[in-house]
Amino acid sequence: MKAGIHPEYHTIKVVMTDGTEYETRSTWGSEGATMHLEIDSKSHPAWTGGNQQLVDRGGRVSKFKKRFEGLGL
């Protein structure tokens, strides 16, 4: 491999929506950084049977619904 063209691979901490923490290796962030997940396998409707609501962060879901409300879907 060529030197100097690959991203740095380091250890980060990931915090799931229920507060569970684990360490993994990633190119995201920097050594020791913490990634807080907004959606994961414990909260995503595809994995929970669709019984939970998606959290509308940044108004994206409401913007989508407003844009397509006249289609009657």
From Swiss-Prot:
The keyword Ribonucleoprotein applies. GO terms for cellular component: ribonucleoprotein complex; ribosome. InterPro entries: Ribosomal_bL28/bL31-like_sf, Ribosomal_bL31, Ribosomal_bL31_A, Ribosomal_bL31_sf. It comes from the Bacteria. GO terms for biological process: translation. GO terms for molecular function: rRNA binding; structural constituent of ribosome. Coiled coil: none annotated. Keywords: Ribonucleoprotein, Ribosomal protein, RNA-binding, rRNA-binding. Pfam families: Ribosomal_L31. SUPFAM superfamilies: L28p-like (SSF143800). Belongs to the bacterial ribosomal protein bL31 family. Type A subfamily. Part of the 50S ribosomal subunit. Binds the 23S rRNA. This is Large ribosomal subunit protein bL31. It comes from Sinorhizobium fredii (strain NBRC 101917 / NGR234). The lineage of its organism: Bacteria, Pseudomonadati, Pseudomonadota, Alphaproteobacteria, Hyphomicrobiales.
